Amino acid sequence: MAPRFEYAQAAEIRDVFARHGVRYLFLGKSGAILLGFPDTTQDAHLFVEKTSPNAEATVQALRDLGFVLSEDEAAEVRRGKDFVQLRNGPFDIDL
């Protein structure tokens, strides 16, 4: 299991996704953490807009964040699969 998800990771997602132009929403406690709620959670939950350009930007942003995506995982993100769990990066993330 990756380290607990905290504000620094939320800010890093925000910054890297902005740099890649990814359209997304933080969901659940990860969103509250980014807004300053003083807590941690086990992972981040994000809703990513399901367009082809956004999906490709998401794959690149995740790799920049340090996620080691298999070809199958990258393909799931690119095709807009409804639920993708990633446990192969600096923290756990659900898309």
Description of each model-found segment:
Residues 1-95:
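Compositionally biased terminal segments of proteins
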